[in-house]
């Protein structure tokens, strides 16, 4: 009854109006699962391949008909007949069918869509929530949200090199209250921006993209908004995080961090040592608890030096650096680079490999942050993954745009379903830092 009988993919649109995949999996019993695949704007060079058609006459070359065809005519034939509950076997079969180290033959987007749909169909068959199916009955930790309320870098037209400025309600008593705190700060920030005559249009992830005078101006305006909303900027209230996305402005030939790419003529150009000094200066000055991709994805010496300097005080998250890949994570653990990994399901391409990366991180004392992509859909699977793994942190955008809110609303539902069992750790989610 739990045998897969049909697999079907179609092309749909993501939050940027670009094509992506939606996959449906059906079983003998009538159980059904659907998965939708996100897409990134700033991508690590070591990520699994997102297969696009390349036909410029259709969707500007970004069509996904090849990936759809791979699901309907290649993957479907291979996994029909499998027990939908055997996630690992199905994921391994797809990996073997692809046969490349980066899923470049079938496309990680094709494989991931099936992987998510299979998990959802299995949960439907067993009549349990997805987070329970994926994580068992010890799933109880609601994640501390990283709310990206200022967008810069490749996510907006704002002249700021850092890609994301986030708020984290570490002092909130519950996820529900933390979400409320974040929403109130978001609206306070909008009011402040309007009063300054700055643009309040939002970027890809729902954050504002105003023309600030620089990074410090952005941070200080966020602190002003936190206080205007009635909260404390610090450990007892709301802290701040960055996604520097440094690979986006690292000049490989000159081996410098060239802020002029986003901030224009006269902006800083920093060596690795100067980049670390600058990040430390920001940490000393502001209530910052997490920095993502503070160094370029291939600047291993820089990462190790940054971790040695700040790794006990601040969460140092590897996104482009690790690309949710256990090979890169294992090297980072061995060499003492970073202390946290960003988890993006489409960077690696299957739920099995995603969970392996989270498990490896936790065993090494690294934190794991479950994350969206800038091109999202209404699919809320990452909310369930965050709870299923007791990850303790989620990064899924600002307090606007339905593609972001869908994940927050799913977490509210999960918190309600868990009732008194639900745990919101807040500041304690950063368990590897010295308090």
Curated annotation (Swiss-Prot):
Keyword line: Cytoplasm, Glycolysis, Lyase, Magnesium, Metal-binding, Secreted
Residues annotated for (2R)-2-phosphoglycerate binding in this entry: 163, 344, 373-374, 395
GO biological process, one term: glycolytic process
Cofactor note: Binds a second Mg(2+) ion via substrate during catalysis.
Enzyme Commission number(s): 4.2.1.11
InterPro entries, A to Z: Enolase, Enolase-like_C_sf, Enolase-like_N, Enolase_C, Enolase_CS, Enolase_N
Top enzyme category: lyase
Domain of life: Bacteria
Binding site for Mg(2+): 243, 292, 319
Gene Ontology terms for molecular function: magnesium ion binding; phosphopyruvate hydratase activity
A single cellular component GO annotation: phosphopyruvate hydratase complex
Residues at the active site: 205, 344
Cofactor(s) the protein needs: Mg(2+)
Catalyzed chemical reaction(s): (2R)-2-phosphoglycerate = phosphoenolpyruvate + H2O
Annotated compartments: Cytoplasm; Secreted; Cell surface
Pathway: Carbohydrate degradation; glycolysis; pyruvate from D-glyceraldehyde 3-phosphate: step 4/5
Function noted in UniProt: Catalyzes the reversible conversion of 2-phosphoglycerate (2-PG) into phosphoenolpyruvate (PEP). It is essential for the degradation of carbohydrates via glycolysis.
NCBIfam families reported in the protein's UniProt record: eno (TIGR01060)
Family: Belongs to the enolase family.
Protein name stated in the entry: Enolase
Organism per entry: Streptococcus suis (strain 98HAH33)
GN (gene name): eno
């Amino acid at each position: 009854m739990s045998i897969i009988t049909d697999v079907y993919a179609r092309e749909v649109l993501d939050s940027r109006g670009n094509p992506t995949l939606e996959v449906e999996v059906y079983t003998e019993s009538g159980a059904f699962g659907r998965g939708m695949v996100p897409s990134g704007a700033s991508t690590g060079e070591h990520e699994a391949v997102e297969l696009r058609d390349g036909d410029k006459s259709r969707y500007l070359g970004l069509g996904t008909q090849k990936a759809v065809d791979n699901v309907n005519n290649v993957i479907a034939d291979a996994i029909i007949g499998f027990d939908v509950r055997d996630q690992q076997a199905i994921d391994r079969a797809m990996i073997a069918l692809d046969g490349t180290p980066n899923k470049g033959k079938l496309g990680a987007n094709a494989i991931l869509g099936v992987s998510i749909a299979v998990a959802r169909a299995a949960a439907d068959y067993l009549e349990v929530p997805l987070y329970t199916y994926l994580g068992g009955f010890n799933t109880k930790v609601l994640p501390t949200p990283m709310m990206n309320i200022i967008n810069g870098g490749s996510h907006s037209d704002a002249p700021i090199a850092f890609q994301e400025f986030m708020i984290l309600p570490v002092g909130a008593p519950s996820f529900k209250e933390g979400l409320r705190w974040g929403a109130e700060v978001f609206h306070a920030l909008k009011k402040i921006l309007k009063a300054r005559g700055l643009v309040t249009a939002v970027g890809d992830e729902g954050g504002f993209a105003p023309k600030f005078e620089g990074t410090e101006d952005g941070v200080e305006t966020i602190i002003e908004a936190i206080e205007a909303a009635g909260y404390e900027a610090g450990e007892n209230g709301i802290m701040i995080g960055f996604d520097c996305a440094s690979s986006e402005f690292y000049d490989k030939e000159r081996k410098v961090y060239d802020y002029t790419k986003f901030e224009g003529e006269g902006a800083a150009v920093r060596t690795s040592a100067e980049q670390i000094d600058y990040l430390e200066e920001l940490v000393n000055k502001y209530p910052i608890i997490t920095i993502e991709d503070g160094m370029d994805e291939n600047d291993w010496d820089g990462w190790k030096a940054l971790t040695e300097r700040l790794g006990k005080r601040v969460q140092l998250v590897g996104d482009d650096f690790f690309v949710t890949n256990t090979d890169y994570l294992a090297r980072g653990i061995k060499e003492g680079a970073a202390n946290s990994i960003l988890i993006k399901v489409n960077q690696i391409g299957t739920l099995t490999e995603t969970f392996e990366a989270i498990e490896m991180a936790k065993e090494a004392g690294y934190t794991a942050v479950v994350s969206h992509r800038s091109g999202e859909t209404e699919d809320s699977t990452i909310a369930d993954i965050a709870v299923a793994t007791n990850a303790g942190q989620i990064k899924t955008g600002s307090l606007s745009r339905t593609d972001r809110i869908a994940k927050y609303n799913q977490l509210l539902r999960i918190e309600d379903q868990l009732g008194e069992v639900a745990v919101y750790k807040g500041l304690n989610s950063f368990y590897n830092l010295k308090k």
